[in-house]
């Protein structure tokens, strides 16, 4: 699936802590339309955190659908993600939505794609999506492997590095965090 322009979302787990952070830039073509968008949210009574890369309106639609699945499945993250992915793949209206979601609860971190994929990251719950994702993933991997920094600091540093390199990512960061 294409990496969407206009954002960087990073999620890291360390110890009993999980953090998702994102930048605030919204771009339309080669123009910055907004610099303080909030692309990271708390869902399901604050027990799930999520971030999106892709079209803003599409992402809000997906957040609503995902939260409905969380309610339907009593907050079971994996089950809700699989059901959303199924709907996203089969529903004609949803199929046109262009976004990726990074979601996490106290136990799991997942990427949900419009292709119907639900992907659990291989290492340290590290997720990096969006145009600056590869830069942020590289930075976060190095920090996880070589420092004892807390998850929030790793996410912040990875977003900063991505923002220094990716023209579609800025330095206006928002974070959501869950402690185990």
UniProtKB/Swiss-Prot annotation:
Membrane spanning residue stretches: none
CDD domains: protease_HslV
InterPro entries named among the record's database cross-references: ATP-dep_Prtase_HsIV_su, Ntn_hydrolases_N, Proteasome_sua/b, Proteasome_suB-type
Keywords: Allosteric enzyme, Cytoplasm, Hydrolase, Metal-binding, Protease, Sodium, Stress response, Threonine protease
Compartment annotation: Cytoplasm
Residues binding Na(+), per UniProt: 163, 166, 169
UniProt-recorded Gene Ontology molecular function terms: metal ion binding; threonine-type endopeptidase activity
Coiled coil: none
E.C. number: 3.4.25.2
Catalytic activity, reaction form: ATP-dependent cleavage of peptide bonds with broad specificity
Short name of any one Pfam family annotated for the protein: Proteasome
Activation and inhibition: Allosterically activated by HslU binding.
Keyword Hydrolase appears in the UniProt entry: yes
NCBIfam families to which the protein is assigned, alphabetical: ATP_dep_HslV, PRK05456.1
Family: Belongs to the peptidase T1B family. HslV subfamily.
Protein's UniProt name: ATP-dependent protease subunit HslV
